[in-house]
């Protein structure tokens, strides 16, 4: 006869626990939303500052020029010194794929939410197509330079024996080594991706300033791009410290910077180009009429 109150008390305790968990979940969601809002606002403000972007360009130059000096002050046996480390295989070797995936989603959301026009969205996304062409073209050019400047060597216990094989393909087919001037494609790609992502992400500050819709999904995609940009900076530093010869890294970074300048610094400002980031997205202030 006394089981009824006990069961009722148990159900009441369960309901209270469920309500408590519901309240806790709401608090956690509120905290996550607040952090997402605050983090995206601050990151947009930093990336949207022209002065800070110029300092960022100076930072990249300093990393490539002076970063190799750190090789004398770091542990050569660290995981980042291995060509087979996780970040090198999963991220650096596929840096353009990661950049296109994250940045493509950001550009798609920003442009379409700002204009609601498919044609304008496609035009802005075409910058990534140009970037892919730049990456493919640079890779082929680097291989051509290596072919034109190289020679074929056979590794022997006493050293290297020079062979007269005419090109890299026949040299490698014979089981030998082809040694030429190798421009660092990783340094080129990471430098190009860093400059490109910083340029594209800077638009978010204007987007927010114009009061355009900026829900949690868009802010999350933006912050993911910021995190990827930070990762590219870190991996660029690791690359210049642990891998490649000094001039190979400097030339790779210089070519990446030049490719960015030709596209974002010059061509994209022309009317027959894909357009610069933010072009045509925001209403211009009405200019005052001139009186005669």
Curated annotation (Swiss-Prot):
GO CC annotation, single: endoplasmic reticulum membrane
Keywords assigned by UniProt, alphabetized: Endoplasmic reticulum, Lipid metabolism, Membrane, Transmembrane, Transmembrane helix
Subcellular localization(s) per the UniProt record: Endoplasmic reticulum membrane
Superkingdom of the source species: Eukaryota
Topology of this chain in the membrane: Multi-pass membrane protein
Side Lumenal, residues: 1-18, 76-94, 163-187, 242-249
Gene Ontology molecular function: any one: triglyceride binding
Positions annotated as active site in the UniProt record: 186, 244
Organ and tissue specificity: Primarily expressed in heart and skeletal muscle.
Transmembrane segments: 19-39, 55-75, 95-115, 142-162, 188-208, 221-241, 250-270
BP GO terms, sorted: fat cell differentiation; lipid droplet formation; lipid droplet organization; lipid storage; phospholipid biosynthetic process
Sequence ranges on the Cytoplasmic membrane side: 40-54, 116-141, 209-220, 271-292
Site (Important for catalytic activity): 248
Chain's role: Plays an important role in the formation of lipid droplets (LDs) which are storage organelles at the center of lipid and energy homeostasis. Directly binds to diacylglycerol (DAGs) and triacylglycerol.
Family of the protein in this entry: Belongs to the FIT family. FIT1 subfamily.
Name under which the protein is recorded: Fat storage-inducing transmembrane protein 1
Native source species: Homo sapiens (Human)
Underlying gene: FITM1
